[in-house]
């Protein structure tokens, strides 16, 4: 039983970006393609050992190599995306990104045959059978295991901010859910998801991992799918909240924000600051507001006593941390509203086309 280790947390500030995409046909609709792209054909060099399928054969995941600094993230992300788009096009597929694909109907799509996913389908049943979600996961290296747990605890309040900004999944199984991120609700139906409780230290977190595996609740620690978690194999804190994004600039904005948060919180930990100890129920309320209202959300502030418009929180965070990307994301049309506008004004073909991940060689 591999539970990772305290020793894995041995570096600070490194980055890793994992993206889940939809494999689509010539009309931009999800189609089974991961067998061809992952198993049957050798991927380009940048994707070797960094390409995998997900639960459905229409969902594929990429991972960047470990990135040494934020300044190198742009090139690393571009290299992986370029390779994926080229690989897909070579074999007659396209690539699209969103939290949920508006044309995906889960009953009409094929599940992967990988034993791990088949075991999940058997154990979890309906919630996993319909899980056509795609997200963005960001890893930031932390050089101490107890620090990583403390940072993950504190990051919980910031997760609804990221979710509200990233929300671009209003449609699920062929209808408008009325939500901005239906992905968040679909995924939250699985066990071991959503907003985690706080852990006292790494020992308590690892004890929890061990209990979940040894009692058969999960097959491996990777099935703890919380919105944020210490990753005891990679030695990182992993943020798993954002919807998948077609625009690489939006991805980089969330990477910039996540790294800045981890650096800020790490410094606070080293200064001996006490944790906020937020109630999970109130953090869940913020998450609900984020997935329901997106850019129009009003979230409970850090004191959990007052509602503040998302725009004010974003501006405050940009000034506090010296970041700018999330301001650009907020000031742009939200992904969910863009999808609704396109479907109403131009139809499903235009909407599907807008989710295409493309590569401009210039």
Curated annotation (Swiss-Prot):
UniProt keyword Ligase present: yes
GO molecular function: ATP binding; glutamate-cysteine ligase activity
EC number: 6.3.2.2
Gene Ontology biological process: modified amino acid biosynthetic process
Keywords of the record: ATP-binding, Ligase, Nucleotide-binding
Keyword Ligase attributed: yes
Pfam families referenced in this protein's UniProt entry, alphabetically: GCS2
Catalytic activity: L-cysteine + L-glutamate + ATP = gamma-L-glutamyl-L-cysteine + ADP + phosphate + H(+)
SUPFAM superfamilies per UniProt: Glutamine synthetase/guanido kinase (SSF55931)
Domain of life: Archaea
Family membership noted in the UniProt record: Belongs to the glutamate--cysteine ligase type 2 family. YbdK subfamily.
Primary role: Catalyzes the synthesis of gamma-glutamylcysteine (gamma-GC), the main low-molecular-weight thiol compound instead of glutathione in halophilic archaea.
HAMAP family: Glu_cys_ligase_2
Name listed for the protein in its UniProt record: Glutamate--cysteine ligase
């Amino acid at each position: 039983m591999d539970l990772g280790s305290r020793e894995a947390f041995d570096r600070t500030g490194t980055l890793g970006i994992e993206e889940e995409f939809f494999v689509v046909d010539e009309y931009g609709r999800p189609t089974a393609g991961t067998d061809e792209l992952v198993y049957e054909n050798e991927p380009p060099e940048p994707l070797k050992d960094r390409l995998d399928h997900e639960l459905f054969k229409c969902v594929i995941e990429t991972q960047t190599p470990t990135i040494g600094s934020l300044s190198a993230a742009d090139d690393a992300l571009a290299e992986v995306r370029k390779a994926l788009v080229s690989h897909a096009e070579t074999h007659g597929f396209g690539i699209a990104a969103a939290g949920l694909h508006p044309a995906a109907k889960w009953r009409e799509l094929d599940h992967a045959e990988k034993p791990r996913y088949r075991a999940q389908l058997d154990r979890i049943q309906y919630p996993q059978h319909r899980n056509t979600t795609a997200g963005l996961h960001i890893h930031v290296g932390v050089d101490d295991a107890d620090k990583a747990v403390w940072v993950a605890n504190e990051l919980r309040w910031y997760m609804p901010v990221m979710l509200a900004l990233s929300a671009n999944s209003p449609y699920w199984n062929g209808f408008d859910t009325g939500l901005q991120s239906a992905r968040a609700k679909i995924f939250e139906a699985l066990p071991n998801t959503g907003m985690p409780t706080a852990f006292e230290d790494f020992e308590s977190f690892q004890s929890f991992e061990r209990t979940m595996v040894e009692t058969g609740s999960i097959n491996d620690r990777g099935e703890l799918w919380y919105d944020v978690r210490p990753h005891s194999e990679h030695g990182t804190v992993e943020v798993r909240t954002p919807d998948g994004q077609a625009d690489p600039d939006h991805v980089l904005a969330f990477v910039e924000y996540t790294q800045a948060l981890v650096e800020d919180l790490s410094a606070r930990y080293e200064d001996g600051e006490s944790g906020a100890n937020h109630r999970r129920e109130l953090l869940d309320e913020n998450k609900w507001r984020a997935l329901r209202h997106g850019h129009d959300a009003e979230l409970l502030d850090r004191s959990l006593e007052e509602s503040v418009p998302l725009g004010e929180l974003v501006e405050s965070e940009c000034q506090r941390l010296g970041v700018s990307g999330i301001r650009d994301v907020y000031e742009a049309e939200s992904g969910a509203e863009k999808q609704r506008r396109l479907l109403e004004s131009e139809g499903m073909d235009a909407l599907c086309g807008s989710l295409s991940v493309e590569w401009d060689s210039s």
